[in-house]
Regions:
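Conserved ATPase-coupling elements of RecA-like P-loop NTPase cores
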Residues: 191-195
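Conserved helicase motor
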Residues: 138, 160-170, 184-190
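Conserved motor-coupling elements within RecA-like helicase/translocase cores
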Residues: 164-181, 197-200
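Conserved P-loop NTPase catalytic core
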Residues: 203-205
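ATP-dependent helicase/translocase motor core
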Residues: 1-130, 139, 143-155, 180, ...
Length: 205
């Protein structure tokens, strides 16, 4: 849903019942540098054009099962997830010259949703065989797993890893349900390359 007044434009996902309309889910559309776009012509060209409008609705909304609310990504979340997915698609993994990257989000800015949407786009595109949410604290992995499962669609599985052996089995698995994995640095660090997992395992997964 998009609302336009002479002074500003707001967009939000339709929450259904009147009591579910909440101002915290009303967003301004901003450009890549987080500058609010107020000119209606820019709104039309940047947000309401085809295929952008279709992409925002089809790929950048999340039906959060935890609070039963349809949510749409804020503009900076959209740019982050879109950029990550695009770079992953363009990367030639056979050259082994790819680099890491990071997304800078502040507290309360929707990091979990951004990371989930990025992983979902990559997994659904087939550009990566595995997407691993690697977290630095075990308690954080439990919290994130709960949130990711709330974001996931009915046909998507978010895999937990209670121990290193289960993590190893998920990494080696060729099952499509094992593409999205949540685990901790501690469990990942227990896996020894060449001993627990071989290049053949990696090639098969």
């Amino acid at each position: 849903v998009l609302f336009r007044s002479p002074e500003e434009t707001l967009y939000f996902a339709n929450p259904g019942k009147e009591e579910n309309f909440k101002p915290e889910f009303y967003f301004h559309w901003e450009d890549f540098n987080n500058t609010v776009i107020r000119d209606w012509r820019r709104i039309v060209s940047d947000l309401l054009s085809i295929p952008m409008a279709h992409q925002l609705i089809g790929y950048y909304t999340i039906a959060d099962d935890k609070d039963k609310t349809l949510k749409v990504l804020r503009s900076y979340q959209y740019f982050a997830a879109s950029k990550i997915s695009d770079i992953t698609h363009k990367t030639n993994w056979d050259t082994h010259q790819h680099r890491g990257g990071y997304v800078w989000h502040t507290t309360g800015s929707g990091k979990t949703m951004t990371s989930f949407k990025s992983a979902q786009l990559i997994a659904n595109s087939g550009d990566a065989d595995k997407v691993v949410f690697l977290l630095d604290r075990i308690e954080l992995s439990v919290q994130s797993l709960d949130e990711y499962r709330g974001f996931a669609g009915e046909d998507e599985a978010i895999q937990d890893t209670q121990n290193t052996a289960i993590l190893l089995s998920k990494l080696k698995s060729t099952d499509n349900d094992d593409r999205l994995i949540v685990t901790s640095i501690q469990k990942m660090s227990n896996i020894k390359a060449g001993k627990d997992i071989s290049q053949d395992d990696i090639d098969r997964s």
